[in-house]
Design a protein with these regions (language model features):
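Short coil/turn connectors at secondary-structure junctions
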Residues: 11-13, 51-53, 59, 63, ...
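Histidine-rich, glycine-flanked metal-binding segment
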Residues: 12-15, 20-66
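Divalent metal-coordination and catalytic microenvironments
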Residues: 19, 39, 60, 71, ...
Length: 171
C-alpha cells in the first residue's frame, strides 16, 4: 500500500502474504510470502511464519520487481499545473513503477544540463521512485541546432529524445 511507501521501509519489517510472485531472476511464478527487513528481502517462501511490524495481504495481487516506464510526461519545469515531478512519480509508484524516464517536452525544454539538474534534484527531494530525465536532441526541440548532449549526459541524463518531433537538420 501507498502508506508503507510514504513511511519508508528502511527500519521496519514487512511481511507480504499470499501474493502471486513473478520474478524472472529466480524463475518464481506462484503464490509466495515475502519477508522484508530493513529495506532488504530476506525470505521468499510459500508460507512464512515470522512476525512483522506490517503485514500486507496481497491476495489477488501480483508481486514482482518494479516496472520501468521509458516514456512519461511530468511537465516540470514549466507546466506544473498539468503535472509535477512529485505527482507524476506518485502516480507511477501507485502503478508499480519504480523508475520512469521523463520526456524533454517541457517549457522550457530540457535541452541543457541545468534543466536536467533541476528535475533530478527535485526528484531526489520528493519522489518515492527513480525519476530520470531525457534531454532534448535539439535546442528548444526545434529540430535544427543540436543541444549540448555531452553536458546533459554528464549531468545524468540517460537518454535523448525529441519526443515525437523530427530532427530536420543534423549538421
Amino acid at each position: 500500500p501507498w502508506d508503507v511507501l510514504q513511511k519508508g521501509i528502511q527500519k521496519m519489517s514487512i511481511l507480504i502474504k499470499n501474493g502471486r510472485v513473478i520474478d524472472p531472476d529466480t524463475r518464481k511464478d506462484g503464490r509466495y510470502d515475502i519477508l522484508i527487513e530493513e529495506d532488504k528481502i530476506v525470505k521468499v517462501d510459500q508460507e512464512i511464519k515470522e512476525e512483522a511490524e506490517e503485514v500486507i495481504d496481497a491476495e489477488g495481487c501480483y508481486v514482482m520487481p518494479g516496472l520501468i516506464d521509458l516514456h512519461v510526461h511530468l511537465r516540470d519545469p514549466g507546466q506544473t499545473y498539468k503535472e509535477t515531478v512529485e505527482t507524476g512519480a506518485a502516480a507511477a509508484a501507485h502503478g508499480g513503477f519504480t523508475t520512469v524516464l521523463a520526456m524533454p517536452n517541457t517549457k522550457p525544454v530540457t535541452d541543457d544540463r541545468l534543466n536536467i539538474r533541476y528535475v533530478h534534484n527535485k526528484a531526489k527531494a520528493m519522489a518515492p521512485i527513480h525519476v530520470l530525465q531525457a534531454g532534448a536532441i535539439t535546442k528548444g526541440q526545434k529540430g535544427k541546432e543540436l543541444a549540448d548532449i555531452d553536458s546533459m549526459v554528464a549531468e545524468g541524463s540517460p537518454a535523448i529524445s525529441e519526443d515525437g518531433r523530427s530532427v530536420m537538420d543534423s549538421l
